[in-house]
Amino acid sequence: MPAPVSRAHTSALVLFSGGQDSTTCLAQALAKYERVETIAFDYGQRHKVELQARLNVLRELKSQFPQWAAKLGEDHLLDLAVLGQVSDCSLTRDVAFKMESSGLPNTFVPGRNLLFLTLAAALAYRRDLQVLVTGVCETDFSGYPDCRDDTMKAMQLALSLGMDKRFLIETPLMWIDKADTWALAESLGGQPLVELIIEHTHTCYLGDRIHRHAWGYGCGQCPACELRARGYARYAEAA
């Protein structure tokens, strides 16, 4: 069995795509841990603009939040083109968004989060990081099976056993909706963090950085934009 994990974690590896959710998770990790590293994956996604967005977010976080800048460690970008080769979905192919006969939207990339966590754990093993932070949730999501709490618990056990190292997978957004995610960001970094998320993070499946809305950039019509817009509207109404 893996060796017992220390109760006092001091470092974490955040799966950071450059979107609203992972940026909020990164902010929480920076508020909680002494050392934080980030990891992302280039898997042949259509909206590669997110790979640039994440660099912009990291730059702005360091500039606007000096108390967090000192905690930000190395950023890692891994080439996972093989995932795009085996996936036939609207995130890796130029096809329209639709629901499949399985009941899942064709934005689902089979195995994506499982691969992400496995590779993140392998890197964390080498970097001596015991906490993996991911922005998956069961509340405002499209039914993706690899976003479920049960899946995360199973992955935590499998990775800990398979690498003989006691990993902890943190899912700060698992039980909150998009409106609460906006509110969480405000509680962590005030209005400056909310504005940073609006201006610099990317969510749109189509990679639209032309159309600016109150909640940020995007086409306003894809499932990701609609979810982000509804959450922001509820957050703004409650503010």
UniProtKB/Swiss-Prot annotation:
Keyword Repeat among UniProt keywords: no
Gene Ontology terms, MF aspect: ATP binding; ligase activity, forming carbon-nitrogen bonds; zinc ion binding
EC number: 6.3.4.20
Any single GO BP term: queuosine biosynthetic process
Catalytic activity annotation: 7-carboxy-7-deazaguanine + NH4(+) + ATP = 7-cyano-7-deazaguanine + ADP + phosphate + H2O + H(+)
Pfam families: QueC
Species this chain originates from: Polaromonas naphthalenivorans (strain CJ2)
Record keyword ATP-binding present: yes
Record's cofactor remark: Binds 1 zinc ion per subunit.
Pathway(s) served: Purine metabolism; 7-cyano-7-deazaguanine biosynthesis
Swiss-Prot/TrEMBL keywords: ATP-binding, Ligase, Metal-binding, Nucleotide-binding, Queuosine biosynthesis, Zinc
Function text: Catalyzes the ATP-dependent conversion of 7-carboxy-7-deazaguanine (CDG) to 7-cyano-7-deazaguanine (preQ(0)).
Family the entry assigns: Belongs to the QueC family.
Binding site for Zn(2+): 204, 219, 222, 225
SUPFAM superfamilies: Adenine nucleotide alpha hydrolases-like
Protein name (database record): 7-cyano-7-deazaguanine synthase
Residue sites binding ATP per the record: 16-26
InterPro entries: QueC, Rossmann-like_a/b/a_fold
Enzyme class of the recorded protein, top EC level: ligase
Cofactors named for this entry: Zn(2+)
